């Protein structure tokens, strides 16, 4: 029956590549996709559209359909730069409406044990932006995990010699949590209570 279906097995394998999707969830999703083909067709069309239209901004490395993105093209405060790990973290900070500066997305966090070194992140691009001389404060908003803390300390060591103020979000956000899952009020309090590194 299904064990001999190469296409079904491939679908299961591809679904399991998504974060948080194990074997059981992949199976449940696959059966749902088969049961509702009209929804599946709309999902496939939406995925195709995203893959062809959405890209990373060449300035901040957030996601956008136009380059540079809306945030980089706006008249936001150019003297303050918030550095986050992932595009979804940018959205979490932006949801608070407490930060009026610009952003820089690293596209990850340092994790030497997993092979994520500074050259694998958008740190060189960050340093180039800072060397332009417009930014006076960098708000480091990496996650409060071992990797996020390591990244924050590494960035602070790289940025401080440039004479730029380096601050870190306050620890009102629980250790080990990801910004995308924290409510806007908590992120806002953390932004307001940020401290020097």
UniProtKB/Swiss-Prot annotation:
One example of a Gene Ontology biological process annotation: DNA repair
Molecular function GO labels: DNA binding; zinc ion binding
Organism encoding this protein: Geobacter metallireducens (strain ATCC 53774 / DSM 7210 / GS-15)
Keyword Coiled coil: no
Keywords: DNA damage, DNA recombination, DNA repair, Metal-binding, Zinc, Zinc-finger
NCBIfam families registered for this protein in UniProt: recR (TIGR00615)
Stored Gene3D superfamilies: 3.30.60.80, 3.40.1360.10, 6.10.250.240, RecR Domain 1
Family note: Belongs to the RecR family.
Entry-linked SUPFAM superfamilies: Recombination protein RecR (SSF111304)
UniProt keyword Endoplasmic reticulum, yes or no: no
Zinc finger regions, C4-type: 57-72
Function: May play a role in DNA repair. It seems to be involved in an RecBC-independent recombinational process of DNA repair. It may act with RecF and RecO.
Domain Toprim: 79-174
Coiled coil: none
Name used for this protein in its record: Recombination protein RecR
